[in-house]
Each structure stands twice: as structure tokens, then as C-alpha cells.
Amino acid sequence: MLTRAKKEQLVQEMTDRFSKASLILFTDYKGMDVQTISELRGQLYEKFEDKARYQVAKNTLIRLALRNASYEEEEWKEQVTGTTAILTIVDADPIEAIKIVYDFSKKKKLPVLRGCYLEKVFHDESKIPDLAQLPSREQLIAMVVSGFAAPISGLVYSLNGIISKLVYALNAIKDKKSE
């Protein structure tokens, strides 16, 4: 059993993490054994190292931390019931984390995804499959860069073609004068 001081410390740590988090994902871990939770944590650690934390805590402590971090109680009240575990992502791509947990949940049928805060905006469980389909931050950057690169590449090829024609014309003039 946790002492009062330990509980206060845990609430403070969660409050700090919730305040900085780009993603807070609420899950119901009922039916998950330690091995399954460890497997999910392993996948998250492999991708994010210490930027991701999948944490099981008492609902009363989670509620206190969410209130302290200024999240709207009407949004999360139904999420923090029963067996609750929370995934938080700090300083990393939240969409990639949603994809990992969503795919894990589809494959293992656990954990049950309840809802999330993505960049401080609440999304209920019906939106999570849509969020999991979004491209990751790296994919979006690649799309933008390729969008910028395509017109530049076209310009380079056009200029290259014009210069080649000019060189051919100058060579033709040179050959004609040398005759």
C-alpha cells in the first residue's frame, strides 16, 4: 500500500507529465496479464524510449493529476473508471504511439481504448481508429518536402533541356563555321 507521501509524489509526477504531454491515451487494461502489459511497454520503449510511459495507477490519483493539469473533467470523467492505464507521450510523435497501441489492441484484443487527449484536444474512442490512420510526423514531413521538390526538379530538368539545346545549337554553328 502506498503511503500518503508516495501518493502525493505520484500525483505530482503525473500532473507534470500530463501538462507536458502531446498525447494522453486512456485504456482499460482489464484482462491483460503482466506479460502482455510488458510486451506493449516494450514496443513503446523500442520506438520512444523514455518519451512514452504506459502507466497503471489508481483512478483517484489519475483524477487528481488531470484536475491539477487543468483538463476538463466533463471530457475525461467517463474515461477514468474501472481498470485504467494511461499512455503519455512527451516530446515525440503522438500519432505513431496511437498506431502502436491501436495495432496492438487489434491483434491482442487488449487493451480496450477509451479516448485520448491529442495536443490537449479530447477525442473519444470512436476517433482513435481514424487517428491511427493518419500519417506520422516523419511521413508528413516527407510529403511536404517531396511536394516542394517536385516543382524544383521540373524546373531543373527544363533548364537542363534548354541549356542542352543551346549547346547543340552552338556546336552546330561552330561546325558550320569550321567548314
From Swiss-Prot:
Family statement: Belongs to the universal ribosomal protein uL10 family.
Keywords linked to the UniProt accession: Ribonucleoprotein, Ribosomal protein, RNA-binding, rRNA-binding
Keyword Ribosomal protein: yes
Known partners and oligomeric status: Part of the ribosomal stalk of the 50S ribosomal subunit. The N-terminus interacts with L11 and the large rRNA to form the base of the stalk. The C-terminus forms an elongated spine to which L12 dimers bind in a sequential fashion forming a multimeric L10(L12)X complex.
Protein name (Swiss-Prot/TrEMBL): Large ribosomal subunit protein uL10
Gene Ontology biological process terms from the UniProt entry: translation
Record bears the keyword rRNA-binding: yes
